[in-house]
Amino acid sequence: MFLLLIILQALAVAIAQSQGDHKIIGGYRCVRNSQPWQVALQAGPGHRFLCGGVLLSDQWVITAAHCARPILHVALGKHNIRRWEATQQVVRVARQVPHPQYQPQAHDNDLMLLKLQKKVRLGRAVKTISVASSCASPGTPCRVSGWGTIASPIARYPTALQCVNVNIMSEQACHRAYPGIITSGMVCAGVPEGGKDSCQGDSGGPLVCGGQLQGLVSWGMERCAMPGYPGVYANLCNYHSWIQRTMQSN
């Protein structure tokens, strides 16, 4: 029985790892600029879309630690990811600060702060959001946004920013779905019947509950939105002090 549990846990870890540059299914097109804290991370000199992110101040963005790359830019004020837009701003990342206890294989402590090369201009299409200082209770309604695939397992990527409404799941439900893997640095969100989820390409994007940033898209099953397998997010309420301290000291 113990060996079987080890095998099942190892399989679950392998499934989580297989997502790579992870993770909207069952959602809808966001109203233009309704998520003004949403950031698109771009990698390399070619500015290839990589991940989502969230604007915390006029010079700091937060995203998933597994989105780290040697060269990063952030695009803000975006709706259509493939077109130039009058509201957009693109700024190079000057410094990447992953959480010091980030564990890539387990996706634990999967968060990273990005200091921008210059301050961004705040306005109607570009706004900051506060990190939640207290954890959300099970059943709390939340919204996730991103430019990740809208179909799974065969990927189909949108041009416009997508939103999906999900609920915070209980710790028990989260542990049942992923036994032996979930830590205090993670929180699950979804719907019991499945069909609504973040997915590949949404990584680092916001889980917003009650107007506060509660989580970042981190990992999940390779096939998204499956019943009984919610998405897993970095549980930012447990990192509030580290986030504030890091931004103030850098």
From Swiss-Prot:
Inhibited by SERPINA1, SERPINC1, SERPINE1, SERPINF2, aprotinin, soybean, trypsin inhibitor and leupeptin. Inhibited by serine protease inhibitor SPINK5. Has an autoproteolytic activity which may have a regulatory effect. Activated by citrate and inhibited by zinc and to a lower extent by manganese. It is found in: Secreted, Extracellular space. It is an enzyme of class 3 (hydrolase). GO terms for cellular component: extracellular space. This is Kallikrein-14. The gene is Klk14. GO terms for molecular function: serine-type endopeptidase activity. Proteolytic cleavage of the activation peptide produces the active enzyme. Residues 24-248 form the Peptidase S1 domain. InterPro entries: Peptidase_S1_PA (IPR009003), Peptidase_S1_PA_chymotrypsin (IPR043504), Peptidase_S1A (IPR001314), Trypsin_dom (IPR001254), TRYPSIN_HIS (IPR018114), TRYPSIN_SER (IPR033116). The active site is at H66, D110, S203.
